[in-house]
Swiss-Prot record:
One term under GO cellular component: cytosol
Gene: dat
Residues modified to N6-(pyridoxal phosphate)lysine: 147
Residues binding substrate, per UniProt: 31, 99, 101
Identification of the protein by name: D-alanine aminotransferase
Amino acid sequence: MKVLVNDRLVERNDATVDVEDRGYQFGDGVYEVVRLYNGKFFTYNEHIDRLYASAAKIDLVIPYSKETLRALLDKLVAENNINTGNVYLQVTRGVQNPRNHVLPDDFPLEGVLTAAAREVPRNERQFIEGGSAITEEDVRWLRCDIKSLNLLGNILAKNKAHQQNALEAILHRGEQVTECSASNVSIIKDGVLWTHAADNLILNGITRQVIIDVAKKNGIPVKEADFTLTDLREADEVFISSTTIEITPITHIDGVQVADGKRGPITAQLHNYFVEEIVRACGELEYAK
């Protein structure tokens, strides 16, 4: 397996970064995960635009143009012969020696790019059967719109869910539902798709954006606004979405069944529309038997 370190492809076991890298010491950087189907990137431009936007919000300069970055990632995918999988890439602010919270005034730090590509098949069974979630207080910072390397709050929530045999932790600030530890959450109520507004309290997921777009195109009403824990528990359907899990239904929340405990009809419809977008961009998909 080869990985990308700046503009070089190297064997994973030979890849190194400096111990004084601010990404390692502070989590000072941004990242993206881009999905591949049939060896083709899906919603690549949207992901890369968000990467550069996240970097701009923290005054981090990505040391490559978008065109150069695309060429590097294409080489990474080809070298590892990825068909259906994920590309993880991150850019840190770079090396500062000695370590200091304050950035140096006399010279700009040079950002460090790393990336890896792995084969990860689609989990068709999960898309249909779904899984459970827990609810957890959202204790993260107030700039969740930045896809930052700082993920400790997400990690703690996700692992708490895992310990309770749940797929996800649905986060809330008081009564207001925001998103999940590693995905967005949406509900269906009276035929309306309801999801939190794209503000500083959530990451505006790329899959979330595609879902909203296909819903509107196909006559499903969309409401981008706050909803409460009560709304969540009384929803007709609940699903989570992200680059890696596509659209996955939530059948139980905190041990309580959602509606009839099965994937709802609008969730199924939205996933069909979503798959149509994938096929349009990347070609026909192989389905798990």
